[in-house]
């Protein structure tokens, strides 16, 4: 049996500790390398939403995104063609990997420019949304497309061209579906926006909810005054005595609020093309129907809304 003096034993122990630590660091290094590879995996594999921007060439939109489902970037180009007067967009054409695929007429939509969005729920489900805007930035065209490999065409899976939908752009996407921002300017409250979820089923998008607590006032964004501070908090000051109702479409009174009091916008319900807003006053909740055609501007519901209406 080998015998060691104290110095030799100390050296052996130190060397053993060094080798053990080196092995630990090697294992840790391998783990970190593998982890880095995981997080550096191309984003094409993940659900995502992004803009396809307009290039320096006016009327052309270019993006490199996965359309065909192979998790590699495809070249997508949307080219617009103006009308004879040069005011509106007459049509747009979609090119995929250098090949012309689909042409859509915008002759009846009075669009000045486009917004192009890309949304990916999964490898199998990728979409292009094209939004056309006209006067006062109103949405006049809005459709979502997916690519069909067999026909080499982009086909519509959701049309928001019914203006009573109030839909604008896709804001999120995941394996379950998409979330779409909506926006409208009721005369009673001014501009508000909200989001609603859609699921993808049988090759089309279906809205899965009619109510949301995401509704927000936009009136506090452009001015700096005391009313802007209220609007930024979703609060409205009554301009007269206002009656709120217990349910949507109901005539049963929940409560009445005197002039000059603050109520808080809490919820939106969209039912049968009608918009109802839920407000909170103290500990009470009540509803108003808004966006009515016969609104009386001379007797507004809320203070300082009329002066902020656009269009």
Name the predicted role of every residue range.
Residues 2-19:
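Short, Lys/Arg-enriched N-terminal segments with co-localized hydrophobic residues
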Residues 20-31:
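Bacterial N-terminal signal peptides that target proteins for export
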Residues 29-40:
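Bacterial N-terminal signal peptides
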Residues 38-51:
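Sec-dependent signal peptide cleavage junction
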Residues 65-73, 119-125:
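Residues in Ca2+-coordinating acidic/glycine-rich loops
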Residues 74-78, 129:
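Structural core positions within WD40/WD-like beta-propeller blades
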Residues 112-147, 153-232:
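Short aromatic loop motif centered on NTY/YTY
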Residues 220-276, 280-286, 291-311:
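Beta-loop motif signature
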């Amino acid at each position: 049996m080998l015998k060691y003096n104290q110095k030799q034993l100390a050296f052996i122990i130190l060397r053993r500790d060094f080798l053990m630590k080196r092995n630990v660091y090697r294992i840790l290094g391998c783990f970190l390398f593998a982890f880095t590879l995981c997080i550096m995996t191309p984003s094409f594999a993940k659900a995502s939403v992004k803009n396809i921007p307009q290039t320096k060439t006016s009327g052309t939109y270019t993006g490199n995104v996965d359309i065909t489902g192979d998790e590699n970037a495809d070249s997508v180009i949307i080219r617009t063609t103006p009308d004879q007067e040069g005011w509106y967009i007459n049509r747009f054409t979609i090119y995929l990997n250098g090949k012309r695929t689909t042409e859509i007429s915008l002759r009846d939509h009075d669009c000045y420019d486009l917004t192009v969005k890309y949304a990916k729920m999964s490898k199998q489900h990728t979409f292009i949304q094209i939004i056309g805007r006209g006067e006062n930035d109103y949405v006049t065209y809005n459709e979502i497309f997916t690519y069909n490999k067999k026909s080499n065409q982009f086909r519509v899976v959701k049309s928001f061209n019914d203006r009573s939908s109030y839909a604008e752009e896709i804001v999120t996407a995941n394996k379950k579906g998409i979330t779409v921002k909506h926006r409208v300017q009721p005369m009673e409250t001014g501009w508000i926006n909200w989001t609603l979820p859609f699921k993808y089923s049988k090759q089309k998008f279906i809205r899965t909810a009619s109510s949301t607590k995401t509704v927000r006032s936009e009136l506090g964004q452009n001015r700096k005054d005391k009313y802007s501070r209220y609007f930024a908090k979703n609060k409205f000051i009554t301009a007269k005595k206002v009656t709120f109702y217990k349910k949507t479409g109901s005539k049963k009174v929940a409560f009445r609020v005197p002039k000059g009091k603050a109520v808080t916008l809490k919820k939106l319900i969209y039912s049968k093309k009608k918009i109802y807003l839920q407000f909170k006053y103290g500990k009470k909740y009540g509803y108003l129907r808004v966006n009515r055609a016969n609104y009386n501007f001379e007797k507004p519901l809320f203070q300082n809304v009329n002066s902020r209406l656009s269009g």
